[in-house]
Amino acid sequence: KALQIQALQRWMGPGRSTTSGDDLVEAALSLAKQGWTEFVLKRPFSTAGGGMKRLTIEEVLQYRGKGMSEKIISEGGLIIEPAHDRILDFSIQYLIEGKEIRQLGLIEQIISPSGQYLGSLSFPKFCSGMNPDIAQFLMEKVLPQYANNARFTESLRNWAEERNFEGPLGVDAYLYRDSSGSLQHRTACEVNPRFTMGRVALDIRRQVAPGHGVCLEIVKAAKLPQRDESVQLLDGRLASGSLVLNEITPHSHFAARIRVAKQKRSLESFDIPTK
């Protein structure tokens, strides 16, 4: 993540990798001069929103004079960036083969208020079921930035080529509202050069009944129903119901589950798992 910020800062926005408490405070004060009052602090290597804190400027100042562990420094330090009032998280799934990059689809990401990943929603039409103002903003201002020939996509391809990377790649992004309430867009908050949960959701959705959507989520194993939920098929493909994707043992804490429905509102309820 630290290297991504350095290489793709034009698209990822203001953020900085820090390797000491004083460095962190300096970065926060610099962001505060730009009008930011809250910040997100995160580890360079973390998954599903782990290792993330939301802090005020007063809380960041408490790091003055403090050091960081050798492990954190070896990872690239702690990353600090402005905290946004996010209203829609999503990911863009690409495939890089040779010198070609191709967009495969967009996935809505479900993120808890604390930044914890809860699940991915994949529907044939990405903007279906969204508020009209958000859908219009997406179609007119946002989605064109991820087209195969867009500047961001070309920058992403160059970034991957410089690192000799080929294969699946997911970009996390989001919409937020600024202090005036206007919609804003962060083109990229993280680049994941691997098979992501969003990519898995996209591939699964292509195997269910036409016109239907999929929710891929992580749930507590203890909350799973004692009996499998009934499923309905349409022309041999899953059209409704849910399926657990991994084997559940007495020692299982979490499970990966898919839910299928034709209407997005049928899939928008989530439990927040805890340790």
What are the residue ranges of the model-derived segments?
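Glycine-rich phosphate-binding loop of ATP-grasp-fold ATP-dependent ligases
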Residues: 14-18, 38-65, 90-91, 113-133
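Peripheral (often C-terminal) accessory segments that flank ATP-dependent C-N-forming ligase machineries
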Residues: 209-275
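ATP-grasp fold ATP-binding core
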Residues: 8, 31-54, 69-86, 171, ...
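A long amphipathic alpha-helix within ATP-dependent nucleotide-binding catalytic cores
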Residues: 75-77, 82, 103, 114-183, ...
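C-terminal catalytic subdomain
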Residues: 185-217
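Phosphate-binding site of ATP-dependent enzymes
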Residues: 63-119, 174-188, 196
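Phosphate-interacting basic helix/loop segments used at nucleotide- and nucleic-acid interfaces
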Residues: 17-26, 31-34, 152-164
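Conserved N-proximal alpha/beta basic substrate-recognition cap immediately N-terminal to
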Residues: 1-29, 46
